[in-house]
Swiss-Prot record:
This is Serine/threonine-protein kinase PLK3. Keywords: Apoptosis, ATP-binding, Cell cycle, Cytoplasm, Cytoskeleton, DNA damage, Golgi apparatus, Kinase, Nucleotide-binding, Nucleus, Phosphoprotein, Repeat, Serine/threonine-protein kinase, Transferase. GO terms for cellular component: centrosome; cytoplasm; dendrite; Golgi stack; kinetochore; neuronal cell body; nucleolus; nucleoplasm. It catalyses: L-seryl-[protein] + ATP = O-phospho-L-seryl-[protein] + ADP + H(+); L-threonyl-[protein] + ATP = O-phospho-L-threonyl-[protein] + ADP + H(+). The gene is PLK3. One of its GO terms (molecular function) is p53 binding. Induction: Cytokine and cellular adhesion trigger induction. Down-regulated in a majority of lung carcinoma samples. Transcripts are highly detected in placenta, lung, followed by skeletal muscle, heart, pancreas, ovaries and kidney and weakly detected in liver and brain. May have a short half-live. In cells of hematopoietic origin, strongly and exclusively detected in terminally differentiated macrophages. Transcript expression appears to be down-regulated in primary lung tumor.
């Protein structure tokens, strides 16, 4: 069969046809398809010629399979060599789409740049040819599609996962830059995932040779959400623009959307040029620092690839050697090789099922008894672990007002997915809002001997009715007035059990949420579920509800607040929640102060006799309040002031 007119050029075509057969792709080896399967493929030309691709020069045929993806110029299909059974991804470009010289030059440029690249994290170029209808580029098949597919299924990835993928992208990108090639279109859809969960950089349709600064291309190209400001300003495209795009990729994987994405393209471009974006508080400090370093307006200010790899985000964070296939659709179990975590798992195994066979029943009972005793010792001293004693008479201790809180370092914080992270903006926002409201209330409050009239029918309030501090081993457990039980674990994760005890809610960070039926909790989370259940049982059996506020049915609270941070002083417990609620429990007389609502601010006071009243903060500001309540408001203000970063 004679070649069709209009082949790309003699040189690239001859190189593809020089060998008697194209190299085997990464798909099934020749032995993968045998006997009847190969006979079936061999019989297809007469029965379904539209599904066959034939190389005009060699006569080799390929069975065109499922559609893998499509772009502006081409569609990509899975293709199988009918003789060897080798599988490829074939990029099919209609001749009608490259009729103009500059369009054809673009395809030729892609082939010239890609064909000689050989790197573990670059999609392998196999061969190419064309016929009268199409141009065919045969590439390494990445059976798990692209990072875009994973992102669409998961929305956000854990930081160890992001490190895993970014290391491979950086490795491939460094190779390209060392060979003087700019990718110019780094985005999730151009990072392909193999059967073994290895990442490959692909799609070199916009790639270009690196030129001296004065000769660099000034055209605007790339995907809008990932384009660097210097490209939009037509200042030329250098390696730094690829680094910028990498920063946008990192942000998208961690946060769920690109940093500069808006509903309007012009507004997106304006944000990019002005580098206007926000860093969520849920990110770890190293992640925020690295993103801030990469997403800088001036290309000269951005870190190099080597500097990125030396950043704390990579050097101090855990990176798995390999990700499970299940991570394409669901959050994986990523347990770093940490001796403390191993000990934690060992302890929880011994306490909650999977007991060692060598232990007799008496030993097992002793272990559980020891846990109960430990819980009692750590909580009873400052907690309602027994029937309440008669309330003491007289005003609250003067020390509540005049003595600075002691031992008030944060004891637990809902953090990002790792250790050693700085306090997030979410906690800071709650603290600053409460500080501002309390200062405004107390500063103008007139003297008074009694409280104003409380609200007759306040909105139902979700508050902490019971709590257990077992942070010396596991974390801080609490029960809400809705009967939902939760634990803020020492590693910064949060798990809750619904009021009907049928649903488990897991938050690896304050912004990432997963829910499971009790019977479908992943195995990796079973130890935490065991601890949560034990806390629930303990609080149910040993602790009294801390006040007479009306109960709230959980069905009426679709998004119960998460405990962000808890702090213990020598006189009180401070709890900060994701909905802005602030609760202070005073040990000595079991009074409680709850700030909630914010628009308007509500102040709920649970007195010594367990009665609860809710007031508008504006009424307290205008009319004053009793000395008891005023002293507790001032102490709460002092606690919050110590939490404020200002």
């Amino acid at each position: 069969m004679e070649p069709a007119a209009g082949f790309l050029s003699p040189r690239p075509f001859q190189r593809a046809a020089a060998a008697p057969a194209p190299p085997a792709g990464p798909g099934p080896p020749p032995s993968a398809l045998r006997g009847p399967e190969l006979e079936m493929l061999a019989g297809l030309p007469t029965s379904d010629p539209g599904r066959l691709i034939t190389d005009p020069r060699s006569g080799r045929t390929y069975l065109k399979g499922r559609l893998l993806g499509k772009g502006g110029f081409a569609r990509c299909y899975e293709a199988t060599d009918t003789e060897t059974g080798s599988a490829y991804a074939v990029k099919v470009i209609p001749q009608s789409r490259v009729a103009k010289p500059h369009q054809r030059e673009k395809i030729l440029n892609e082939i010239e740049l890609h064909r000689d690249l050989q790197h573990r994290h670059i999609v392998r170029f196999s061969h190419h040819f064309e016929d009268a209808d199409n141009i065919y580029i045969f590439l390494e098949l990445c059976s798990r599609k692209s990072l875009a597919h994973i992102w669409k299924a998961r929305h956000t990835l854990l930081e160890p996962e992001v490190r895993y993928y970014l290391r491979q992208i950086l490795s491939g990108l460094k190779y390209l830059h060392q060979r003087g090639i700019l990718h110019r279109d780094l985005k999730l859809g151009n990072f392909f995932i193999t059967e073994n969960m290895e990442l490959k950089v692909g799609d070199f349709g916009l790639a270009a040779r690196l030129e001296p600064p004065e000769q660099r291309k000034k055209t605007i190209c790339g995907t809008p959400n990932y384009v660097a400001p210097e490209v939009l300003l037509r200042q030329g495209h250098g390696p730094e623009a690829d680094v910028w795009s990498l920063g946008c990729v990192m942000y998208t994987l961690l946060c769920g959307s690109p940093p500069f994405e808006t509903a309007d393209l012009k507004e997106t471009y304006r944000c990019i040029k002005q580098v206007h974006y926000t860093l969520p508080a849920s990110l770890s400090l190293p992640a925020r620092q690295l993103l801030a370093a990469i997403l800088r307006a001036s290309p000269r200010d951005r870190p190099s690839i080597d500097q990125i790899l030396r950043h704390d985000f990579f050097t101090k964070g855990y990176t798995p050697d390999r990700l499970p296939i299940s991570s394409c659709v669901t959050v994986p179990d990523l347990t770093p090789p940490n001796p403390a975590r191993s000990l934690f798992a060992k302890v929880t195994k011994s306490l909650f099922g999977r007991k060692k066979k060598s232990k007799n029943h008496a030993q097992e009972r002793d272990e559980v008894s020891g846990l109960v005793s430990g819980l009692m010792r750590t909580s009873v001293g400052h907690q309602d672990a027994r029937p309440e004693a008669p309330a003491a008479s007289g005003p609250a201790p003067v020390s509540l007002v005049e003595t600075a809180p002691e031992d008030s370092s944060p004891r637990g914080t809902l953090a990002s997915s790792g250790d050693g992270f700085e306090e997030g903006l979410t906690v800071a926002t709650v603290v600053e809002s409460a500080l501002c409201a309390l200062r405004n209330c107390i500063a103008f409050m007139p003297p008074a001997e009694q409280n104003p009239a409380p609200l007759a029918q306040p909105e139902p309030l979700v508050w902490v009715s019971k709590w257990v501090d077992y942070s010396n081993k596991f974390g801080f457990g609490y029960q809400l007035s809705s009967r939902r039980v939760a634990v803020l674990f020492n590693d910064g994760t949060h798990m809750a059990l619904s009021a009907n005890r049928k649903t488990v809610h897991y938050n690896p960070t304050s912004t990432k949420h997963f829910s499971f039926s009790v019977g479908a909790v992943p195995r990796a989370l079973q130890p935490q579920l065991g601890i949560l259940r034990y806390f629930a049982s303990y609080m149910e059996q040993h602790l009294m509800k801390g006040g007479d506020l009306p109960s709230v049915e959980e069905v009426e609270v679709p998004a119960p607040p998460l405990l962000l941070q808890w702090v213990k002083t020598d006189q009180a417990l401070l709890m900060l929640f994701s909905d802005g609620t602030v609760q202070v429990n005073f040990y000595g007389d079991h009074t409680k102060l709850i700030l909630s609502g914010w628009e308007p601010l509500l102040v709920t006071f649970v007195a010594r006799n367990r009665s609860a009243c809710t007031y508008l903060a504006s009424h307290l500001r205008q009319l004053g309040c009793s000395p008891d309540l005023r002293q507790r408001l001032r102490y709460a203000l002092r606690l919050l002031r110590d939490r404020s970063p200002a």
